Amino acid sequence: MTVQTFIPNGAKAASENTVNQPVHTSDVSIKKLYIETQGCQMNEYDSHRMADLLGDSHGYVLTTDPKEADILLMNTCSIREKAQEKVFSELGRWRKLKQQNPDLIIGVGGCVASQEGDNIQKRAPYVDMVFGPQTLHRLPQMLDQHQDQIEKPKKDKIKLVDISFPDIEKFDFLPEPRVEGFKAFVSIMEGCSKYCSFCVVPYTRGEEVSRPLDDVLAEIAGLAEKGVREISLLGQNVNGYRGETFEGGICTFPELLRLVSEIPGIGRLRYTTSHPLEFSEELIQCYRDLPQMVSHLHLPVQSGSNAVLQAMKRNHTIDVYIEKIAKLRKIRPDMHLSSDFIIGFPGETEQNFEETYQFIKDLDFDHSYSFIYSKRPGTPASELEDTTSEAVKKERLAKVQHWIKQSSIRKTDAMQGTIQRVLIENVSEKDPNLLVGTADNTRLVTFVGDPMWVGRFAEIEITEIKTLNLVYGELLNLEPDVA
């Protein structure tokens, strides 16, 4: 989990990858917006939508320099304590910018905003607006309210805080998403109803609410018409999707995947974040039937110990997880698997950890988001006694991360001589004769080709391993352009 400056869609900067940047302009009459995004891909998606929204409503243009911005927005994450403290650390830096420019508008959104509410303005009174993940669509109105209050005496000003949970209303008010590049995120549901003992998501984003099926399909079809070829479906518990159909029925997540696969132009499907409980037989069969489904799965498990899973209230066992992955790999032997791991959960014994470590090796994960447990106020786990020292936790985490990194290296090395289906995304910054794309397993693939091929899929034979995430190859076959 990282903190990153918001940049337009397509935006994973890498050694051989070029990205679309916000337009820079010297015209001081143009209002400029800076968004800092913390945390998950849901937040990244929300930041895109904030930019679309304020661009349409107030004409704001994105900038990568907070010093030249007229409005600063921070889209926050509260999963871990350190991430939460980074919010106030960054706000301290933004305070200096506001001292230099009193007209600067500062807004805080996301999960920390939802959790802290007006406490943010008590701790940082120079913050003008606080809004939650479900109320970002009200930003234009909040901005207008702020402008209306500028001339009022301080005693007459009201705090602009909106952290309510108006179901799925926000999607009805967001503009059509802008397209930059050939990949796009599409949020299909919000919130989570699992109430794992360590997690704040149900309290900061609310319980699970699915977008109507027709809305999701219409958004994806619109993106495909604009050249998007890879869709990543998003949700805190994305495979628990149950969207209402036009006829009043319910569409499950596997049914949604099958419908999306029929949309012309969509050549690749990903999703995150999923839960083992809803990783159903029907979902596994989608990997058998739908070539658009990538051979890469992120399925958070959190621990490889049944005792720890029970304390986490995950409501499944390790055997259930292993059985589902075995079925999936029988269909897709080349499946790359990643997961989330919480190390040092309260009560985790040395035996519990060793069970997790062995589990990681047995399932051969090649990527993970692994962290030391972070106590979150208001969660059941925050009341549990924690007797493990920080030194032991750090040692355990290092052991897990080292093994997974070595596994990732082995899997990248094993790509030598294989044929990979690659989405060609851009021309290399370093060499105009080279094209850059991504394989199913997220590795960057570089090869010699015509810039006119950008946006198409190709079969590439891997000829050289450059780094952990970068390989070189040669073109074997260029798929027809579906545009």
Swiss-Prot record:
- List UniProt keywords, sorted A-Z: 4Fe-4S, Cytoplasm, Iron, Iron-sulfur, Metal-binding, S-adenosyl-L-methionine, Transferase, tRNA processing
- A single Gene Ontology CC term: cytosol
Coiled coil is among the record's keywords: no
Details of cofactor binding = Binds 2 [4Fe-4S] clusters. One cluster is coordinated with 3 cysteines and an exchangeable S-adenosyl-L-methionine.
**Coiled-coil intervals:** none
Q: Which reaction does it catalyse?
A: N(6)-dimethylallyladenosine(37) in tRNA + (sulfur carrier)-SH + AH2 + 2 S-adenosyl-L-methionine = 2-methylsulfanyl-N(6)-dimethylallyladenosine(37) in tRNA + (sulfur carrier)-H + 5'-deoxyadenosine + L-methionine + A + S-adenosyl-L-homocysteine + 2 H(+)
The family assignment reads:
Belongs to the methylthiotransferase family. MiaB subfamily.
Q: Give the quaternary structure.
A: Monomer.
Report the protein name in the record: tRNA-2-methylthio-N(6)-dimethylallyladenosine synthase
Instruction: Give the organism the record lists.
Output: Acinetobacter baylyi (strain ATCC 33305 / BD413 / ADP1)
